[in-house]
């Protein structure tokens, strides 16, 4: 048997140690952000996906180069479409 000493009990519940307080706050914030991410992930990632797809600004670029860039982007999209399975719902 190992003798028990007084003062070895866990004091996590009533601890005022700054490290414990900071860890608790970070844990709670992480949990809140994770829940929000799971609830709104479709909206968030759709906005990020289409918000970043606008491409670079075309100010000062000749129209012929703009058209060439559009064609390159479209051909890249056409190539990528072959990797996906299209499911049509009736």
From Swiss-Prot:
- Residues with site note (Essential for channel activity, seems to be protonated during channel activation, and may play a role in the channel gating and selectivity): 30
GO cellular component: a single term:
virion membrane
Q: Does the keyword Transport apply?
A: yes
Covalent lipidation (S-palmitoyl cysteine) residues? 43
**How does the record describe its quaternary structure?**
Homotetramer; composed of two disulfide-linked dimers held together by non-covalent interactions. May interact with matrix protein 1.
Task of the protein: Forms a proton-selective ion channel that is necessary for the efficient release of the viral genome during virus entry. After attaching to the cell surface, the virion enters the cell by endocytosis. Acidification of the endosome triggers M2 ion channel activity.
Q: What name goes with this protein?
A: Matrix protein 2
The taxonomy runs: Viruses, Riboviria, Orthornavirae, Negarnaviricota, Polyploviricotina
């Amino acid at each position: 048997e190992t003798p028990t000493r007084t003062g070895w009990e866990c004091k996590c519940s009533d601890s005022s140690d700054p490290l414990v307080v900071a860890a608790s706050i970070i844990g709670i914030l992480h949990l809140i952000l994770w829940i929000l991410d799971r609830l709104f992930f479709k909206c968030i990632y759709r906005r990020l996906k289409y918000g970043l797809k606008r491409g670079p600004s075309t100010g000062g670029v000749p129209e012929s180069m703009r058209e060439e860039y559009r064609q390159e982007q479209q051909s890249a999209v056409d190539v990528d479409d072959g990797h996906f399975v299209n499911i049509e719902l009736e």
